[in-house]
């Protein structure tokens, strides 16, 4: 199957849509081993190793490294503050193999923040990164928590650099959205003050916000689809059993995905389950749990964006000026995930 040719070596860099180039300080930090590891950690939480058509048809894999560079570029473009841009660059530095699958493993399905605790220690344990921070006049405390900087990150459904980047990254690499459309979205954004008088990325024109929110909602639905939730729970249980049997350690999860996969393949029973995972082409669901099939009933964090848009009456949330989007977003948020989901294999 085409999905088996998955490789991060083909990762497409499209981040010049945000900025033609990054400051040298950021580029040097991106070259450190702790950041280079993220080239081998995917954005799709292990789902890209399945045979789902959406990944088979993707333009290229999408790594945490590409996402991190893009986030840093967006923050720098709107703030020209190195401290904030570095925090954006490093925000995923502690992402484990299969990313939010480890949150499922930790029982953190709904918040998906359990893996962020290592960010401080991952930066501190990198002599190369610490030296570059010192050379730039930055401290560890300046850059170890991008939540401090609202352009870099804020609470959903607000728009931040992080949410903007993965929305446009997926739009380009997975949904095949033309680069010109992405540039139009980026070019329409400006920094305004939200309801709490805090800086937030805003759209100047409702028609551009409409284009963006269509992409955003499509992504939101995909992130909590039956396929996605099933795959993440399947992998979480596989990792749990690998950890319980000593095939993996928690520290192994903070190497890269190929290392973790090699460990799984070293144990015959786990290897068979991994190979079954690679053959999943989709899912089915129902109220009743099927007899004789592995099935899950699991909820997940609903990510959504309701951006601010400039109107003649000031800045307003897009749901306040577009009833169609408001209805679709409400329907998305209403899903209670109260159904059993099981796999379809190739």
Which ranges hold each PLM region?
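Histidine-centered, transition-metal-coordinating active-site segments
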Residues: 6-83, 97, 101-346
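Acidic, Ala/Val/Gly-enriched low-complexity intrinsically disordered segments
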Residues: 1-3
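Short alpha-helical catalytic segment bearing the HExxH-like zincin motif
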Residues: 84-92
């Amino acid at each position: 199957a085409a999905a088996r040719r998955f490789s991060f070596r083909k990762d497409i860099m499209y981040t010049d849509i945000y900025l033609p180039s990054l400051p040298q300080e950021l580029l040097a930090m991106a070259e450190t081993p702790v950041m280079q590891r993220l080239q081998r950690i995917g954005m799709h939480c292990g789902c890209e190793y399945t045979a789902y058509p959406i990944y088979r048809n993707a333009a290229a894999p999408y790594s945490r490294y590409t996402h991190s560079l893009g986030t840093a570029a967006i923050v720098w473009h709107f703030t020209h503050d190195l401290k904030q841009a570095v925090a954006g660059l490093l925000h995923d530095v502690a992402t484990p193999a299969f990313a939010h699958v480890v949150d499922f493993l930790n029982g953190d399905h709904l918040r998906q923040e359990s893996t962020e605790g290592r960010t401080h220690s991952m930066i501190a344990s990198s002599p190369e990164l610490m030296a570059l921070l010192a050379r730039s006049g930055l401290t560890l405390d300046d850059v170890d928590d991008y939540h401090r900087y609202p352009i870099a990150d804020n609470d959903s459904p607000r728009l931040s650099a992080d949410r903007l980047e993965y929305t446009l990254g997926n739009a380009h690499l997975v949904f095949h959205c033309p680069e010109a459309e992405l540039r139009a979205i980026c070019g329409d954004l400006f920094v305004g003050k939200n309801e709490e008088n805090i800086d937030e990325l805003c759209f100047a024109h409702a028609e551009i916000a409409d284009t963006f929110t269509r992409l955003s909602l499509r992504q939101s639905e995909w992130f909590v689809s039956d396929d996605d939730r099933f795959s993440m729970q399947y992998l979480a249980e596989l990792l749990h059993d690998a950890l319980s049997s000593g095939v993996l350690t928690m520290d192994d999860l903070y190497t890269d995905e190929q290392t973790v996969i090699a460990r799984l393949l070293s144990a015959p029973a786990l290897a068979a389950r991994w190979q079954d995972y690679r053959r999943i082409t989709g899912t089915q669901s129902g109220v009743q749990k099927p007899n004789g099939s592995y099935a899950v009933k699991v909820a997940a964090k609903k990510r959504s964006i309701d951006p601010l848009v400039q109107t003649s009456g000031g800045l307003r949330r897009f749901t306040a000026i577009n009833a169609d989007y408001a209805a679709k977003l409400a329907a998305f948020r209403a899903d209670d995930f109260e159904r059993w989901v099981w796999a379809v294999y190739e």
